[in-house]
UniProtKB/Swiss-Prot annotation:
GO biological process: N-acetylneuraminate metabolic process; O-glycan processing; protein N-linked glycosylation via asparagine; sialylation; viral protein processing
Membrane-protein topology: Single-pass type II membrane protein
Subcellular location: Golgi apparatus, Golgi stack membrane; Secreted
Post-translational modification: N-glycosylated.
Documented effect of changing C24G: No effect on dimerization and on location at the Golgi stack
Lineage of origin: Eukaryota, Metazoa, Chordata, Craniata, Vertebrata
Phosphotyrosine: residues carrying this PTM: Y369
Protein name: Beta-galactoside alpha-2,6-sialyltransferase 1
Pathway: Protein modification; protein glycosylation
Keywords of this entry: Disulfide bond, Glycoprotein, Glycosyltransferase, Golgi apparatus, Membrane, Phosphoprotein, Secreted, Signal-anchor, Transferase, Transmembrane, Transmembrane helix
Gene: ST6GAL1
Length: 406
């Protein structure tokens, strides 16, 4: 009897000690990275499993010897230990928090954010609802579809209907060249795409959108080879020396965008572009007359910005949305489903800005000039994929506007 009681006490001590150790390890690891949190979960389960086996093994003799004196107590002890052994922590992945705010920025980026609020280069005077208006994911998709007009400058738009522009703009609407497609991929230029091995998956889509000067050569395994649309900012078209000659800019449909003063119409924007890319645009069209090359209407970025401000928890940078966010909305207009790669960071998250350059800055993930943090909040809210896809692949999945019913 004394021997049995000693065994019971020893088993209880071991149980308490191991549980205490698991809690300590969990608290310490909780401070670590996304990946450490995921590994800890697996280790916790293994420890609990071993703990259950150990407790069951050491108590089996105690239960059998004491069951003759108190059989009900023996069954109760055995049942509780089996329950412990079967317990599994639920799968969870630390991914982008859709309620992120400026409080999540490091001090340097907080200062930049405040500076842009005071600068207000584009003369933003938002008078809409918010900030902090709450939408369900379904309602927000409808709100975007109904209030953000994805359209290109046309030959009938002044001053593009003058003799100065005759023959330069594409005659066909982009809708006759692009889509409708089923599954589409939007491939960011993030440094975390390096070593992702996502190339084959990306190329498996019906259409692929890339940004600015992001290459595929030498990076095929990670980013694929297909380019259906390339969205470029006006700075690249104006200042990139290789733009007129590099074959990178001869593949797929090209779209250039340039920010205007807040909600300016086309004539006002034309008089005061952010970058005067018009001459280079014309030169390119002379060199490559058969290359589809469109100009995004300047109203669209600010229509999107208004919604970002409406739903965000605070004032956002009064600067236009990023090319990444514009590209996502463009593809939601043309596709039934849009898979977005490394816009929401995966476990490969890094301060390396681009997969094809060694340039380090946390602003490339969190945003500085563009309201990138709030754009990521929106995408996370709309995501129909899993947190596991975000964590492992950096993939968010959004439905196209044609597939939703409002």
């Amino acid at each position: 009897m004394i021997h049995t009681n000693l065994k019971k006490k020893f088993s209880c001590c071991v149980l308490v000690f191991l549980l205490f150790a698991v809690i300590c390890v969990w608290k310490e690891k909780k401070k670590g990275s996304y990946y450490d949190s995921f590994k800890l979960q697996t280790k916790e389960f293994q420890v609990l499993k071993s703990l259950g086996k150990l407790a069951m093994g050491s108590d089996s003799q105690s239960v059998s010897s004491s069951s003759t004196q108190d059989p009900h107590r023996g069954r109760q002890t055995l049942g509780s230990l089996r329950g412990l052994a079967k317990a599994k922590p639920e799968a969870s992945f630390q991914v982008w928090n859709k309620d992120s705010s400026s409080k999540n920025l490091i001090p340097r980026l907080q200062k930049i954010w405040k500076n842009y609020l005071s600068m207000n280069k584009y003369k933003v005077s938002y008078k809409g609802p918010g900030p902090g208006i709450k939408f369900s994911a379904e309602a927000l998709r409808c709100h975007l579809r109904d209030h953000v007009n994805v359209s290109m400058v046309e030959v009938t738009d002044f001053p593009f209907n003058t003799s100065e522009w005759e023959g330069y703009l594409p005659k066909e609407s982009i809708r006759t060249k692009a889509g409708p497609w089923g599954r589409c991929a939007v491939v960011s230029s993030a440094g975390s795409l390096k070593s992702s091995q996502l190339g084959r998956e990306i190329d498996d889509h019906d259409a692929v959108l890339r940004f600015n000067g992001a290459p595929t050569a030498n990076f095929q395994q990670d980013v694929g080879t297909k380019t259906t649309i390339r969205l470029m900012n006006s700075q690249l078209v104006t200042t990139e020396k290789r733009f007129l000659k590099d074959s990178l800019y001869n593949e797929g449909i090209l779209i250039v965008w340039d920010p205007s003063v807040y909600h300016s119409d086309i004539p006002k924007w034309y008089q005061n572009p952010d970058y005067n890319f018009f001459n280079n645009y014309k030169t390119y069209r002379k060199l490559h007359p058969n290359q589809p090359f469109y100009i995004l209407k300047p109203q669209m970025p600010w229509e999107l910005w208004d919604i970002l401000q409406e739903i965000s928890p605070e004032e956002i940078q009064p600067n236009p949305p990023s090319s990444g966010m514009l590209g996502i909305i463009i593809m939601m207009t043309l596709c039934d489903q849009v898979d977005i790669y490394e816009f929401l960071p995966s476990k490969r998250k890094t301060d390396v800005c681009y997969y094809y350059q060694k340039f380090f800055d946390s602003a490339c993930t969190m945003g500085a000039y563009h309201p990138l943090l709030y754009e990521k909040n929106l995408v996370k809210h709309l995501n129909q994929g899993t947190d596991e896809d975000i964590y492992l692949l950096g993939k968010a999945t959004l439905p196209g506007f044609r597939t939703i019913h409002c």
